[in-house]
Amino acid sequence: MSKKPLILGIETSCDETAASVITENEQGNPIILSNIISSQTDVHKEFGGVVPELAARSHIEKIDLIVQKALDKSGKKIEEIDAVASTAGPGLIVCLSVGLSFGKAFASSINKPFIAVNHLEGHALSPKLVSNLDYPYLLLLISGGHSQYLKVQGLGKYKRLGTTIDDALGEAFDKTAKLLGIEFPGGPQIELWAKKGDPNSYDLPKPIINKGGCNLSFAGLKTAILKISKTIKTEQEKFNLAASFQKTIEEILKKKTKIAFDEFEKQNKIQEKIFVVAGGVAANKKIRSMLINLCKENNYQSIFPPIEICGDNAAMIAMVGLEKYKLKKFNELDYPAKPRWQLDESALFLKGAGVKL
C-alpha cells in the first residue's frame, strides 16, 4: 500500500489564524486529520470591524502555536508532511503575508514543496471535503468579503456567473448590525433579532433586482438602513428593521439564485443539478431554508458544508493543496501575496469579485 500524501494547510487572509493537516483514503477522497481555527473577535470588537495591522500582529503571535496544535491533533510529525499549502490571496495583504511567509519557511525547512492557494478556490472546492461531488456544480459563495455565483468545473476551472458589484453580503450584515448597536461581529445576531420583529415594517430597496443578470448589489440597501436607523427610538423598532433586512436579503437571493439556475442550465445539459452554498453567511438558517426550498422547486440537490468549513478555515486550503500536489503543481518560494485574485481570470474585475477590503 503506497503512502498517502499529508498536506499542511495555512490560512491567514483576514481575521482567522488557521492550520490543518489532511490526507486521503484509498478512494482518493480527502480526510481531515485536524482543523484548528483561532478567531480574533476580541481583538477587533472595540473597533467595530477588522483592523488590518492588529489582525496581522495577532497572526504573527499565534501562527506557531496554531500550526503546532494542528500537527499534534493530526498525530503526525513535522517530517511526515509532504507539502505545505498557504493562502496567497485574495485578502488583506498584511495578513496574507504572515501565513504565506510562514508556509514558505516551513516548506523550505523540511525540503518539501510549497503550494500557493487561492482562498476563493478553497471555498469553491470545500464541499469535496465532505461530499463526493461530480463536476460541474453551481456555487453561491456568500461571506464577509465575497458574494459570487460560480460554475465549478474542476480544479482551476471556474466560470463566474455573477458577483456583487459593490459590497459583499456578509459586510452588509455586519454593517447593519453595527447600526443597530450589535457588537462586532454582529452579522450572525441579525437573524436572532429578526425573529423578534415584523419583517413587513420597512420597505427596503432591492438594488438591481430586475437587471444585471445574477449580479448582486448591497450598497444601496446599506444606505437605506443607515437613514432608517437614525429615526429609530425603541428596541422593537430595531427588531423590526432587522426582520425587514433579513426578509429583503432572502428575496434578493431567491430572485438572483433562480436567474443563476437558468444560466447554469443553459451552459450545462446534465441530469443531476447540484447547488452548493459556502461562506460564513451560509450559516444563516433562514437563508438556508429558503435556498433549500428553492432547490426542491427547481430539481437541484442542495449542499451546505458543515459550519466549521463554511467560514475561513485551513482544511479547504490543505484540500486544494492536496489536489495540486497530486498534479505536481508546485510554486516557487518567491510567489507573491495577491490581495486581488479572481478565480475566473477571464471575468471583468469588479470590487466584490476577488478582494477583501
Regions found by a protein language model. Give the residues of each.
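Short Gly/Thr/Asp-enriched flexible loops that form oxyanion-binding sites at enzyme active sites
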Residues: 86-111, 285-293
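Glycine-rich phosphate-binding loop plus the immediately following alpha-helix
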Residues: 143, 154-198, 222-233
